[in-house]
């Protein structure tokens, strides 16, 4: 086959509304559309190693090619001639190169555009503390954080420092001065960037991902010393998120980190993407924890198991459980019951909330009205 021109195929799949593009050996290019993988075999034949290497060379500079050769796993950002940005991961499988490309929006979506709850704006405007957006890969965490940073940029005079691997959304200076640092090009790793940030007079620090103990420790310290820190984890609930952070600490330091989280954690947004029933894309579905005094006491006293029930009864404080939100969206006919059940944490709770929202289950579940 002829050489694939990366600029052209990326523009092509963007027009189709795809979120991801994959190249791997012995299969045609593969896209992800509305969460589902589809091959482009009708437009392109199978790829081979030489063609994939050619695509890599089209996207990389000498330093990136050296990193790929040395590590066999490299992240970087790539901009097409049409001006659109992409997050690229080059990796090896069975000794051969493969590429995963995430298509990014050029415009930074507002919290309103994303249909996100007002409490996220409240979290974004806090003068200090730790805000975490969590969820599996591809759940829209970076987009939610971009919307929150943009809200800060429009509504507050502040110095914002982001540390990302790679930079996904490019923020202009609006009311804020925004400096964005990319791992590899600007700084070696997240932990070092966080420690350096404390000497750079920031008000708000965005950490793309809290990957290890050193980064978590540095993020908590930054929040504790008077900065608003936003970051992500790959956890699926608020309680899991808190436990994950505590568990990375040695046992003799765990009471200390409980106290630090109790004093500094502002909120946890755990999200997943669900296909819309009308087939027009996916919608973010969230569990939201607002760390009130009562929640702080639960964290400090190691009663994390009580947090889930506190979320369910915390509507007045802007909280909601994932099952509540899934039930609400099902009752409004925005998502389907089968998709909701696949993502829910507790099927009985989901159906109980569905009944409260006036929804009618189709799965044959007998709902108690008591």
Task: Please give the residue ranges for each predicted region.
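Short, flexible helix-loop junctions that flank or precede catalytic/ligand sites
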Residues: 1-370
């Amino acid at each position: 086959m002829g050489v694939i021109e990366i600029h052209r195929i990326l523009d092509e799949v963007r027009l189709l509304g795809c979120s991801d593009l994959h190249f791997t050996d012995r299969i045609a290019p593969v896209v992800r559309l509305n969460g589902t993988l589809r091959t482009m075999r009708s437009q392109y034949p199978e790829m081979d190693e030489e063609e994939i290497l050619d695509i890599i060379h089209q996207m990389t500079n000498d330093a990136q090619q050296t990193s790929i050769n040395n590590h066999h796993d490299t992240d970087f950002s790539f901009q097409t001639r049409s001006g659109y940005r992409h997050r690229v991961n080059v990796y090896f499988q069975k000794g051969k190169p493969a590429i995963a490309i995430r298509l990014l929006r050029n415009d930074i979506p507002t919290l309103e555009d994303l249909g996100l709850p007002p409490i996220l704006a409240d979290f974004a405007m806090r003068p200090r503390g730790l805000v975490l957006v969590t969820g599996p890969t591809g759940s829209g965490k970076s987009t939610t954080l971009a919307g929150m940073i943009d809200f800060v940029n429009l509504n507050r005079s502040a110095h914002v420092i982001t540390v990302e691997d790679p930079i996904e959304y490019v923020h202009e200076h609006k009311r804020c001065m925004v400096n964005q640092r990319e791992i590899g090009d600007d700084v070696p790793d997240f932990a070092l960037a966080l420690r350096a940030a404390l000497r750079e007079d920031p008000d708000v620090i965005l950490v793309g991902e809290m990957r290890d103990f050193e980064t978590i420790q540095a993020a908590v310290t930054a929040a504790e010393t008077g900065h608003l820190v936003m970051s992500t984890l790959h956890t699926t609930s608020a309680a899991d998120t808190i436990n994950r952070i505590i568990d990375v600490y040695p046992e003799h330091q765990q009471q200390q980190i409980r106290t630090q989280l109790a004093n500094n954690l502002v909120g946890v947004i755990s999200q997943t993407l669900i296909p819309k029933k009308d087939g027009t894309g996916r919608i973010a579905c969230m569990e939201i924890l607002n760390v009130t005094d009562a929640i702080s006491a639960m964290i400090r006293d190691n009663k994390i198991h009580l947090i889930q029930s506190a979320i369910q009864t915390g509507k007045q404080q802007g909280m909601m459980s994932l099952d509540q939100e899934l039930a609400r969206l099902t009752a409004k006919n925005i998502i389907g019951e089968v998709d909701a059940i696949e993502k829910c944490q507790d099927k009985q709770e989901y159906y109980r909330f569905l009944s409260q929202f006036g929804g009618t289950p189709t799965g044959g579940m007998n709902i108690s009205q008591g």
